[in-house]
Amino acid sequence: MNIAHIGLVGYGEVGKIFSAGLRVQPGVASVAAWDLKLADPAHRAALQKHAGQAGVVAVDAMQALCARCDCIISAVTASNTLAVAQEAAQHIRPGTVFLDLNSASPGTKQQAAALIEARGAHYVEAGVMTSVPPYGIRVPMLLGGAQAAALAAVLTGWGMDAQPVSEQLGVASAIKMCRSIMIKGLEALVIESYTTARHYGVEDHVLPTLAETFPSIDW
């Protein structure tokens, strides 16, 4: 698998981080981006300025992005996952890789894949396993789909942490979803416990008991 021209759908925090990180990788000739805000006069100038300074080509439509790129990366909100796939499917070229980074359900990813693969393109789902900003493009990712292993080989060659887990779509997303339930649940419990302990003035008494029960955690 050869990838020379990369396109980001979504030029928010994740899109900007991936654009900057991928643009300098060996073999990457160009990085472009499309975001709905580029069609909004209130936001267009600022996004175009940022993209220009970052060496990213800001295009004016999904069609233009698909026409120039052999790898499309979807980095939007979970609620827009399917809408992006629907629009991309109207313009994507056969053989293009479509990497879906969004935190959508396995079922949504499968629906998105059906749209993309019906056009002869290759859909690969990614389960992004933690927050992107501390890691940049090296954020741990699990990949799923028929081309997951081939894409992982390219991404790891760029120093990324991409692990293929299954050719079956939905597996990577399910793993990420189940992990998120646990992690976010634990975070919520810790915050609630700390807040309540501080409210009652017993924080200094609660923390030692937690440290005794869970000695490996720095409470």
What do these predicted ranges mean?
Residues 62-123:
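Rossmann-fold NAD(P) dinucleotide-binding segment
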Residues 104, 109-184:
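Rossmann-fold dinucleotide-binding core
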Residues 1-67:
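NAD(P)+-binding Rossmann beta1-loop-alpha1 motif at the extreme N-terminus of oxidoreductases
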Residues 11, 74-77, 101-102, 140, ...:
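Glycine- and other small-residue-rich loops at beta-strand/loop junctions that grip anionic moieties
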Residues 13-17, 64, 72, 97, ...:
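Amphipathic alpha-helical hairpins
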Residues 30, 55-57, 97, 122, ...:
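Conserved beta-strand segments of alpha/beta enzyme cores
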Residues 23, 52, 117, 156, ...:
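Anion (oxyanion) recognition and catalysis
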Residues 175-219:
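Helical "substrate-binding/catalytic lid" subdomain
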